[in-house]
Curated annotation (Swiss-Prot):
Species, as recorded: Arabidopsis thaliana (Mouse-ear cress)
Domain F-box, first and last residues per copy: 2-49
Record InterPro entries: F-box-assoc_dom_typ3 (IPR013187), F-box-assoc_interact_dom (IPR017451), F-box-like_dom_sf (IPR036047), F-box_dom (IPR001810)
Pfam families: F-box, FBA_3
Protein known as: F-box protein At2g23160
Length: 307
């Protein structure tokens, strides 16, 4: 009688989630089931949770198109302690491999990188650049299907927490009814699909993803959105990652979107400060004697638009 039994894949995942990232990268070569397990979003989440006893800050440096990824322990703030804490950064991996070009535009308005749930998205805005998804801990990556671009583009890496799927939302400028595309990462044959968005706008903010919904700010003043009775020049775009549907609601001024305790919040200055010019033109438009007030509004209900 054979008393031995195979180790379950869940137990293997539990064990591997506690080993160093370089070892995880090598374990992909053990077998196809192991390689498949390590690629799953579930394992990425588990590894980020179990591999370190303390929360970590992930950061990267870029030199000559090569990204170097590091992590740093995040120590809790102690108000009563005056002693400084010294910590050394842990190097993980360099990316991309040799002979692969990834464009990196230094202008934040082109959104040339994104991060969510343990994966990093890198893309360039020219036709020669390759778009990739990278695991900064193991160095594993996937090259995304080519998408023809002849206009300025925007895209976001998002994570759908129920089905645990990574998706990429892509938009071309000027954004029209058929200028939005979606790709589900990790499927056997990754393909871009066209999704419809009836509102025309230009993206003027970074994206904020909260509980399966992606939020970003759109400027609508340059287009005649005749199907909408718009009173203001800006709208917050809400993209449901699971259903792949858009909803919109107007906002009377330019603002910055943030995640505030698990809810969407907007912040903006009043009076003498042109915040949009300061943030996106990278110039100091603030007069020395400027009077301003910082406003913070938290969205309590998306459907009712209650703040």
């Amino acid at each position: 009688m054979n008393s031995s039994s195979p180790i379950s894949i869940d137990l293997i995942a539990e064990i591997l989630s506690r080993v160093p990232s370089k070892s995880v990268a090598r374990f992909r070569c053990v077998s196809k089931p192991w390689a498949s397990m390590i690629r799953r979003p579930y394992f990425t989440e588990l590894f980020l949770t179990r591999s370190s006893p303390k929360p970590c800050i992930l950061f990267a440096t870029v030199a000559d198109g090569v990204w170097s990824f590091f992590s740093l322990p995040q120590y809790p703030y102690e108000k009563s302690s005056s002693a400084s804490v010294a910590a050394s950064a842990k190097f993980h991996v360099k990316f991309p491999p040799n002979n692969m070009r990834i464009g990196h535009n230094s202008d934040r308005r082109y959104f040339s990188y994104g991060y969510t749930s343990g994966l990093i998205y890198l893309y360039g805005d020219s036709s020669d650049d390759r778009s990739v998804i990278c695991n900064p801990y193991t160095g594993e990556y996937a090259i995304l299907p080519y998408l023809q671009r002849y206009r300025k583009t925007y895209s976001f890496l998002v994570f759908e927490p129920i089905e645990k799927q990574f998706k990429i939302l892509f938009m071309a400028y000027l954004s029209g009814d058929r200028d939005h595309k979606i790709l589900t990462v990790g499927t056997g044959n990754m393909k871009w699909r066209t999704i419809r968005c009836s509102l025309r706008y230009e993206i003027v903010s970074e994206g904020v993803s909260i509980n399966g919904v992606l939020y970003y700010l759109g400027e609508t003043s340059a287009w005649d959105n005749k199907d909408y009775d718009l009173k203001y020049d800006y709208a917050i775009v809400c993209f449901d990652i699971r259903s792949e549907k858009f909803i919109f609601f107007e906002i009377e001024r330019f603002c910055r979107l943030i995640n505030y305790k698990g809810k969407l919040a907007v912040i903006y200055f009043e009076d003498d400060v042109n915040y949009q010019s300061c943030l996106y033109r990278k110039k100091n438009y603030v007069e020395p004697d400027a009077i301003n007030k910082l406003n913070v509004w938290v969205l309590e209900d998306v459907e009712k638009q209650e703040w």
